[in-house]
Amino acid sequence: MLNNLRARLLSLKFRAIRRAVIILIAKIPKDLERAITFGDALNHFLMISPFRPLFKFSVPKNIKVNVHDLTFDSPIISASFKDDVSSLFQWQLIGIGGITYKTVLKMPSKGNLRPRIQEVSHDGNYAILNSLGLPTKGVMKFLPQINNKKLTKFNRPIGISIGGNSFEEYLSVFSEIDHHLNTIDFSQFFYEINISCPNTDDGKCLSDDLESLKNLIIKFRDISSRMIVVKVSPDITNEEVLKVCEILSNLSKTAINIGNTKYVKASDVGLSQKTFSKEGGGLSGKSLYANTLRMVKLVASNYDLPIIATGGVSSYDNVKELLDNGASLTGMATLLVSDPFQIPLINYRLSNE
């Protein structure tokens, strides 16, 4: 009960401080990324300060989830949108079951021009629209970060999201990372293949060519025995998602992540060219949940395949409903940046079902 009270108090303080930071830093000119940068710096300070024990919550032992050869301490994992160690460390400290690094490309990229991430309202719900465009330090600068002891000491699965602008780039990045993983002791890694990103310039996705996707995953499986997750877009059709599942079901140690952010025009959520550099971007938030649940039911009723349900998951009720309908894990993004201290509260309720 004391842990619950502490989580609730931290939740209130976090939301108040976050709102104050956004008002003071991100409103004029409107650019949420400035508040995010400030928040990341503040979080880094807290994670190396004497206050760090305040953020530590034990995870109930009876909510572990086994997916292939990996054991997740909680069915809640982070979606692939961050790679700074302090954030990933904090989320594990508060009780997340596993983490996923944001998408890695072969070469460094600054992504799209700012402003490229904003708070919006969609269908009456809080949401975030981003057109980051996959900013990345590149695979060679990413490799030394992988075996960070602050993250591996939790002994929870760590996902690595892999992207590419071509078949060859996906294969090159995967090969470089897998070769590096074979040189380190920590073994709880898995791969997430990002075949759909709604805010890149050419708009092309590997999901548009399922034969190439099949050939790519076969090559991945020839290289590595680690679990391979394919992340699909919420805009994918029923027929397409079932075809992806068919490919995965014929290979060992695979899973599907449903799904990514949803493409929305900036003007449809009240943003102008001054407040958003691209015509549209990827929407995350509560309004995605109904479609996430629908897709989980579709996949679970047709294939015996581990499912990670990502998109609009924002409460215990969401997590419970997804798990009850066939999801193995639930991925979170917006909740982790808006109120991460809901995680220990959700874990507690899951343990007392």
Identify what each model region corresponds to.
Residues 117, 121, 125-192, 197-204:
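Active-site beta->alpha loop and helix N-cap motifs at the rims of alpha/beta catalytic domains
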Residues 47-57, 195-208, 241-301, 305, ...:
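Glycine/Thr-rich beta-alpha phosphate-binding loop at enzyme active sites
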Residues 111-125, 265-281, 323, 329, ...:
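C-terminal helical cap(s) of enzyme catalytic domains, especially alpha/beta-barrels
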Residues 2-155, 346:
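N-terminal capping/small domains of soluble enzymes
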Residues 1-56, 283-304, 308, 314-353:
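Alpha/beta catalytic cores of nucleotide-metabolism and tRNA/nucleoside-modifying enzymes
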Residues 122, 127, 137-156, 210-230, ...:
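Alpha-helix-loop-beta-strand connector modules within alpha/beta enzyme cores
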